Amino acid sequence: MIERVKIENLRSHSSTEIEFREGINVLVGPNGAGKTTVLEAITLALFPRTFRSYDHMIREGERRAVVEVVFWGADGHKYKVRREFYRGGGQRNPRLYREEGDGWKVVASGRAEDVDREVMNALGGVDRDVFREAVYIRQGEIAKLVEATREERKRIVDRTLGLAEFKKAREQAHELLRVAEAKLETFRERVRDLKGSKKELKRVERELEELKREVKELEPEVEELKERLNELREAKREFERLEGELRLLENKIESLKGRRDDLRKLVEEGKEAERELQRLGDVPSKVRELENEEAELRRRIEELRNLLDDLRSLRNRLESAEEELEGVKRELEELKDEAGVDPERLVEFKDKIVEASERLRDLRREEELKRKLEKVSDELSELGDREETLQSEYEELQERLDEIQGELKEIRVKEKELLERIESLREAEGECPVCLRKLPRERAEKLLRDAEKELERLQGREEDLRKERRELKDRLESVRRELEGTKERMWRLRERREELERELEEIEELKEELADLSRELGVEEDRLPELRDLAVRAESLLRDLERRRGDVLRLEKELERTLDRCEKVIGRTPSGVEDVEEELRRLEEERDHVGQKLREAEGELERYHNLEEKVKRAREARKELKRIERDLEDAKGRLEQVERNLEGLRERYGSEDRLEEELESVEKKYERVRDKLSEVKGRLNGMEKRREELKKQVRKYREAKERKERLERVVEVLSLCKEVFRYSRDVAREKVLPAVEREASKILQDLSDRYGSLRIEDDGAVIRVSVPGGHFIEADRMSGGEKIIIGLALRLALAMVGSSFAPFIMLDEPTVHLDAEHRERLAQALRELDLGKGRVRQAIVVTHDEELEDAADELWRIENRAGESRVERYSG
């Protein structure tokens, strides 16, 4: 049973301690509050998983996380396991303690494997797999037992009920029996073999003498054949090498002759090409002259075309500009008639007219400005009162903050004195640390408790003062900001009041200016807005008039400059656009004539280049021809040498066929004699080894016989153990499975009216549930929600009946996928569970559904505040 869990810097938990009771303990809170982390902390303490890094579990900004769990073991002792997980460093300093008297004794520490093993022993043999399959039912895995395959389901049931141990023991006995029987049969055969060892030993020694004589005769013959074989093989390789070289030389000579003929042909073609080049003359120079002439004509044509386009464009633009100039003049006449004033005079007074029109709106704002001025004055008065109030509160808060700071200093001095006194009392051995008189143990303990109690009171007071100081600082900062904001607002309002007063003075001046302007223009004041638009329009038209006149003059000058540029191209000043067009046609005809002559010359140029290439190839062919003739002479000389070497081999060994026949004959004889020698030596070595083995076997005969008799007795005992384990498992299953069926059926009926009873068949491989109508169906054929209900009932029943369980279970969000009715039924079922009756004495349930609160013997609420999990106890 879990008694207490402490968490430091694990996920969202900064510092959390929870004490659990026997019965149902419920941790309730919204999603993301950190409920499941409590179950993860228990799992990390008891059976930690091995990660490459635990950084993802350590709280952000912290160096390490610590989990500590106090639990009751299967032996009735209380244990405490503590583990530390470091960022980037894995698990360190794991320790397991057992309570003894008033203190804790270390059971295991240092190596994580040692601590894991002792934790498993303390829980009555529950290992990591059983814990994760049965004790800790994780979110979304309630239906795992129902949805598993038959073999997997049977394996889980056996492990959770302790039946797997019988199977494991029987399998071990079976394996030992198999090994023992194999060894027994081996020794039986050995005993039988050893009986004839003496007779076989004499026979082997006779055969050894015969084999040694035979080896002595065969070894000289093998050496003689080996030497002759090497000589013949070398001769064959030389035959093959020389014949291969001969063929290569003959092919090379033929190839060189063919290449020599080709090169001579190229040389003759080069001579003919040189004569043809002399006849053609300097064709490239002729082509370059025609290309330059054509390029110059193209340049002049392109330039003249561009000038012609410019002339046409300028003529069109000049006509458009003259039409636009006349249009602007007409608009100015119309504006003069509409305004009754010359446009030039309107433009002269435009700025005054516009300003007067704009400021006429200010006259209408006079009353509005007076109201705003009155409102600003009233607000300034109110803010002055608020400033005095805030200043007074700020001074009072600062005074209280100074008082708290002084009291905190006094408390820290007292705490230091108390800590020194406590340390002295703990180190003192029967005498007062102050007066050094003899101090009774009871008196010393009372003084120590009083000092610790006073220290605890001071620490509590210090925490209260620190909390009040934080609140005062927050309020002081809030008042300071509001006071600064008030002063800033008053300064802005004073500026606004001065601005409004200036605007009212300007309005009085404006009235006088408008009257003067109306008299000067000879119009009424109410016509000023109308004249403003006309003045703006008159100014725009006058500017447009000047711009149009400038455009006409500019286009006329540009047209003259373009005609001057045409003179540079055609050599005279053209009379107009038509004259330029006629000159352009003449240049294009001349360009076409030159182009025709160029194409004819380019045809001759291509033939000229081909002839040059032939001359070049002929020069290269002359050089290569000399090299080919030298190579040909060398190849003929080497060919004669190879033929002489081949003739010498034939005189010594005859023809190549005769050499091949002799080589084949010698190889066969050599292999035959060598194989026979190897066989004899192999037999000889085998016989010698066999002789040594037989000598050892004779000595071991009695020992083998004794071991055979002992193994016969062991086989008899193991056969009996195997049957005992099988029978014990069957008896245990017949006893335990009906109890699981009864408990699961009861819980299932509490969870839903739809179901009757639950059956476990085929030793746990098949789960059947009765439905309305009285018939049973397999649980794995039901819907997802039904599987969850059945899986939950079966898990709880296994926990209550199982013999290999720790005396507690943990449920993580068991209401997921359950509707409201089934959540209420689950709560009712948990309330009615008699946890003290079976081995399961405690259930720890994590949920976000408040329906399970009524089922709790102990209720804890977890919330996440500003990224940190906070735990509050609500019952107990």
Curated annotation (Swiss-Prot):
Entries under SMART domains matching the protein: AAA
Gene Ontology MF: a single term: zinc ion binding
Zinc-hook domain: residues covered: 387-484
Source superkingdom: Archaea
Cofactor note: Binds 1 zinc ion per homodimer.
Record carries keyword Ribosomal protein: no
The keyword Nucleotide-binding is assigned to this record: yes
InterPro entries, per the entry: AAA+_ATPase, ATPase_AAA_core, P-loop_NTPase, Rad50/SbcC_AAA, Rad50_ATPase_archaeal, Zn_hook_RAD50
Domain notes: The two conserved Cys that bind zinc constitute the zinc-hook, which separates the large intramolecular coiled coil regions. The 2 Cys residues coordinate one molecule of zinc with the help of the 2 Cys residues of the zinc-hook of another Rad50 molecule, thereby forming a V-shaped homodimer.
Protein name, UniProt field: DNA double-strand break repair Rad50 ATPase
